Amino acid sequence: MKKLNNKGFAISTVIYAVLIIAVLIMGMLLSTMVFSKKTTDDLVYSVEKDLNSHIEEQDIKISSKICKRARTLHSETCTSSSTTGYCTAGGTSITYGQLGNTGVLTSGDAFDCDVNGDGNYDPETERFYYITDLESDSNIAVLVFYTNAGPDGTRSRGTRPPYHSSNSYSGPRDAASMLPTTDAWPRATLYNRTSQIYNEDGGTTVIISTSTTTVKNLPIYTYSDTVAARLLTYKEFSQMSTTAKNTFLRDVGGSHPTDWPSCIWLNTAYQRGGGIYGQVYAIYSPARETIAVRPYTPNQSCGVRPVIEVKKTDIDY
């Protein structure tokens, strides 16, 4: 019987042990590398996810704004066939509004507002001008549309309703019915839907001249929930800068039926009444932005220029 080579056996055992240890160490290293790679991948994924989420959040914040400051301005150059008030009053060319300064709202600043909710801020068809702050809340801006409009919310030459077909001291029943609807302008906002109608002096009565002198109380008027805008008031117009007032020269003027309306309704009553039906104020053209009283008969018509009220937090200015 052969004796075991103890020395050789011992060496073999050591070698096997070293190999086993090496394999274990390599396994641990590989496991660590895999874990490290997974951890790195997870970290990268987490950072990318957070970054993308932040970017998307910022995009949503920006796109959720109702109005953005305009980058270009509307202008008009008169020709021999021009029929707007500015041109028929002897004008040659005009630029409407101003681009303004970042972080500051100035009367006449131009904005593009996504009132129809399609995600686009169309400078041609969704142009508005800042007028002033809402009297009851300085955190809300009052903006006026660039042109006359009808219920569909688009530029309209033919929309020219009476203020109120029966009398002018009961509120803008007929004029308000021709304002853009909430279906046409779903993103437009009004925070002052119900308010007192005043005369030009801030009073709440008018004098009607009949066979005797009669005093009529002006109503607290509520615009229908189906309309997305309101009419401008005499006081708001008087607070506008010349640049802002000149925006009303767009698409106003002429007395021919195919011309643009020669006046734009304001929701302010004439204190002295103006006959048995009463009268309200209107922006009159072609004598530029002159204020006049209308109507001479209840059915006399003017254009409507929609006004919206937008929280300043909903405006990118």
Language model region names:
Residues 63-317:
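Collagenous Gly-X-Y triple-helix signature in extracellular proteins
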Residues 47-65:
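N-terminal low-complexity, intrinsically disordered "leader/linker" segments enriched in small/polar
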Residues 9-31:
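N-terminal single-pass transmembrane signal-anchor helix
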